[in-house]
Amino acid sequence: MDTEYEQVNKPWNELYKETMLGNKLMVNVGMEDQEVPLLPSNFLTKVRVGLSGGYITMRRFRIKIIPLVSRKAGVSGKLYLRDISDTKGQKLHCTESLDLGREIRLTMQHLDFSVSTRSGVPIVFGFEELVSPFLEGRELFSISVKWQFGLSKNCYSLPQSKWKVMYLEDALKVLKLSKKKASKTDSSV
């Protein structure tokens, strides 16, 4: 699983961290235990001086899943976030079963906790209950993940937020219908 990380140079309170998993991401049936960290372990060591004594707050998650197989293939699965800071490996969030043959955009306002800068960001994501008619080794989809984080002096918790799931073709249909309605009302006026 190839992972590329890109840092945008901005002040800490506006720092965006982008993780891009390109077409080389392999998601195979029977290999659901592959997990990807939201932040590389070496990132915090590079900026340790500017981070001493604070907490990282994570918000505005945006995940885009682009299928590399036909919609008719019947590929599906659930995306989850997991905390690996202890042996329990608590699952933080999990989606309903997604149709992975369609382009999907998932968003979440925030994670409901902050993480100490001394410990890194022990959050990983992966897939479970994958269903696919393809043999192992077939590339099923690519994923891009964007999230915003900043620094906080205090540890805090927020109410748990939920994933918002939007299938791109459904959103386009709604947009076309709203444009048609708008043009009809404009012509009748």
From Swiss-Prot:
Q: Which GO terms describe its cellular component?
A: host cell membrane; membrane; viral capsid
Instruction: Please give the Gene Ontology molecular function terms for this protein.
Output: RNA binding
The entry's function note states: Transports viral genome to neighboring plant cells directly through plasmosdesmata, without any budding. The movement protein allows efficient cell to cell propagation, by bypassing the host cell wall barrier.
Whether Phosphoprotein counts among this entry's keywords is: yes
Disulphide bonds annotated for this chain are: none
Q: What is this protein called?
A: Movement protein
**How is the quaternary structure described?**
Interacts with host protein HFI22.
Against Pfam families, the record matches this protein to: TBSV_P22
Q: What family classification does the UniProt entry report for this protein? A: Belongs to the tombusvirus/aureusvirus movement protein p22 family.
Q: Where in the cell is it found?
A: Host membrane
Q: Does the keyword DNA damage apply?
A: no
> What GO biological process terms are annotated to this protein in UniProt?
transport of virus in host, cell to cell
Post-translational modification as stated in the protein's UniProt record: Phosphorylated.
